[in-house]
Every structure is written in structure tokens, then in C-alpha cells.
């Protein structure tokens, strides 16, 4: 038992239940109203129900995590580092499962490519075979015309001979040859009418398989690539311990999780259907192939040999009618030579018939060669090998890997919610300043920086180093003498009815400035 056959038997154990939850015996009937299609729909609904349950679990955990009070006491570096390590390990496992999914996808694509190429080769060989059979049938029709001329000539020449017994034998042999040639011509027409659309059926199967496989392969590659990019973004956020990156990954990862589980819900019934086709697909194969089904079954089970006698039954019967004609033609020539003494008319008509029979013998050999078992056997076997061996194994590996990927994504989304309060918001990235920045000019000495760079020179230490006189805003009375106020020469005017303004501290060294207070 091969690995593929083991998988096919394993999938057969899965119950096929209709919408009434009754076991159905309908196998691989893809009609919309069939019970088998209902069974596949229930399997898809089962996968969707599991995914919905996991989604509800994630949402509940996220709500609880969002409502949880942020306690900074437990926010230690060790815990953050440990959580980042766990997320990194889960992400690596997800990457590994994605790689296995891509490998399985390529494995299925290779198997389907083998099947499609076998259909193409079978179609080409079948076209050659049918062309040889058509030429064989046309040669039989031409031979029938020449046999009719020979019969007319024999009837005319028989009136000149007196040997009635030989003439009667000639008529009998000629009738036998004519009947056999007529049967060959009629069988050729019947064969063409019966198998005339076989090429179209093969081409239709090739187009359907090519379209399905190309779309399936491209769809999975795009989705898995997007999932890989999202996971890579999450890994970067985990390594940088970025709160914003973790939140963004949670949002995008939620949709990726939904997509992965939708793929699981769709892929599982398709895998079961493929296994059922390989195990019990004769009914649908017979329906789609029609008259070609028996021929395909023959080439699938025949043993290829170097001889040309291993042919399908319709072709073998068609060619076997020619076996007795050469011997009958030789006997006919001997009798006509004796009866008609090598008459020119008889010789010419007999030569034309002989040429036609020789041509038919050559075409019969061509039909046997182009329709023999060794011509089609490998292509038919490769079709079953690519579909029921490589594709089944690839789909099984893909199902296992994407199921594990869905589980790991579920765990990842649960764990990543714990980082919302543990990871800190990273500062903005460093921005390079240009040459016009007044706070950090490039290539300029600090002495050229304006004093009022801060908007005011208050509390600016550079003000003290300037040569301008101080305004006493930063150093108080640094430039004034340290004499007490009562020791200074101050005059007080007498009290009068009219107050006159007198310069205050007129003898002060700073009286040449505009800051004066008059009383």
C-alpha cells in the first residue's frame, strides 16, 4: 500500500452526511442537489463553525485585555523579554508552516501538471490514431469501387468462358472480399461517429484542469505571501518591543486568521472530493468520457509489449477483418488467370484491387502501431499518478500544515494581546537637521549663535559674556558700587504746595541712560 492509497482510505472514513444527518451512499456526485454535495457542504460548515468559535474566543480575550487595568508594577524587563521570545518562537513556527504550505502547493501543482501533460500527449496520440483509422476507412471505400468494377468485368468475361465451376468460385471469393471490405468501410464510419467528439472531450478536460490549477495555485501563493509579509511585520514589532507595531499586527493578523480558516473550510471538502474521485470516480468518469471510457480503461490496465496486436477491442475488430483478404485475393488471381487466360481487362481491374488491398494492409499496420497499448499506456497511467498520487499527497500535506498554521495564529493573537500594556510606545525616529537649523547650525562656531536664540536673553548665560552694558536683569547690581543706600548723597526737596519733578539719582553713573524716574 502506497502513502497515497493510505490517505485515500483515511479520507473514506470521514462520514458523508446529508442535510438530514443521514449517511449517504452517493459518492462523488457533484450535482448541486445531490446528497454528496450536501455532505461536502456540511464538512465546510464544520470548518467554518470551528473558525467562528476561535474568533469569538479571540474577541473575548481582547476585550478582557483592553479592559484590564494597566499595572506598572509587573512591567519588568524580564517579563517583556520573555514575552517577546515567546512571540518570536510562535512566529517562527508560523513561518515554517507557511513554508510547508507553499511546498505542498507546489507539490499539488506538479501533480496536476503531470496529469495535464498526459492529457495533451494522449490527445496528440489519439489524433494520430483517428487520422490513421480515417485513412483506413477511405481506402476501404476506394477498394469497394474497384471491386465493383472487377465484378462487372468478371461478369462480362464469364460469358466468353465455358468453365462455369471456376466462374462460380470466382464469384464466391469476390463476393466474400467485397463483403469484408464493405464491413470495414461501414465500421470505419461507425467508429468515427462514435468517437468523433473524443478529441473535444479531452480538450475540454484539459482546459478545465488547467484553469482550475492555475487559479488555485496563484490564489494560494498570493494569500500565503500576504500572510508571510504580515508575520514578518509582526516579528519586527516583537523584536523592537513596539506597542504600536503590536497593535497594528493584531488588527491585520485578525483578518489573516479569518482568511486562513476560510481556506481550511474550503480545502478540506476539496481534499475529500479528490480522494473520493480516486477511489470511486468511475461513475463520473464514465459520464464525462462517454464512449472513450472503455478505451481509457483498456490503456490503463493493459500491459505494453513491443508487438502491435495489443489493441482496444473496437480497433482490433476493425483491423481483424482484413486478415483473410490477402489470401482470398491470391486465390482469386489464380482462378481468374485459369478461367480468363490473363485477359487484359481482368488483369487491369485485378491490379487496381490489389493495389488498394496493399494500401489497406499498410494502413492497417499504421492503425495497429498508432493505437497499440504502449502508445497510450504511460500517458493514461501518468494522469492517474499525477491526480491520485502526487495531488492527493500534496493536498494532505497542505491540509495538515494550514491547520497547524491556523492553530499557531490563534495562539499568536491570544499572546500578542498581552503586549498592549507591556510594550512601550517607541519615540519618533531621529530626523537629520539641515544647515538652516538655528539650534544646531552646521559648520558654524558657537560664538555666532544669536544671543536672543531663546526668544529672550533672560537666563541666557551667553549674555554675561557680551560686551554690552548689563541691564541688571541677570546680575542684579553687578556694575554698581556696593555702598549702602543711606550712605549715598541723596537730597530731599522741601514740602511745598506744588510738587515739582526732580531727577532721581542725577549723579548716578548711569544717568546718561533713558531709565529715569522723576517724582
Curated annotation (Swiss-Prot):
One GO MF term: volume-sensitive chloride channel activity
Segments in the Extracellular topological domain: 1-42, 104-217, 267-395
Pfam families: Tweety
Transmembrane regions: 43-63, 83-103, 218-238, 246-266, 396-416
Region spans: Disordered: 459-485
Membrane topology, as annotated: Multi-pass membrane protein
Residues bearing attached sugar chains per UniProt: 142, 163, 176, 328, 341, 348, 389
CDD domains linked to this entry: Tweety_N (cd07912)
Any single Gene Ontology cellular-component annotation: chloride channel complex
InterPro entries: Tweety
Protein's cellular compartments: Cell membrane
Cytoplasmic side, ranges: 64-82, 239-245, 417-519
Signal peptide: none
Keywords linked to the UniProt accession: Cell membrane, Chloride, Chloride channel, Glycoprotein, Ion channel, Ion transport, Membrane, Transmembrane, Transmembrane helix, Transport
Annotated family: Belongs to the tweety family.
Function: Probable chloride channel.
Name the UniProt record assigns to this protein: Protein tweety homolog 1
Gene name of this polypeptide: ttyh-1
